[in-house]
């Protein structure tokens, strides 16, 4: 079981690296260092990578205890929410006119992402504690 949890933790590290790649690409696009075509390719590759990580984690989950399975379910749900919030945030940033309403929405999404990251880290720590 410890080996399976370690596989999940490594997959989660891969997921974090994919988010970093996405963040770097978004920043490069905003700074006009890469164009929309390159951005589209990167988004597609990151999406495929995230889907693969999620699938791998679900496959590993099958051999875990009930408690660990529940933690994995929670992890996957938090990660899904994080991805949705990330996409919404980037969409808002692209069309933002710096209105007070948009700035409030951006701040709320950034706070949500920070909260989700903490929750994800807590789940990962709980998984480590279970083994």
Curated annotation (Swiss-Prot):
It is found in: Cytoplasm; Nucleus. It comes from the Eukaryota. Keywords: Cytoplasm, Nucleus. One of its GO terms (cellular component) is nucleus. InterPro entries: REX1-B (IPR039491). GO terms for biological process: pericentric heterochromatin formation; subtelomeric heterochromatin formation. Its main location: cytoplasm. Monomer. This is Heterochromatin silencing protein rss1. It comes from Schizosaccharomyces pombe (strain 972 / ATCC 24843) (Fission yeast). The gene is rss1.
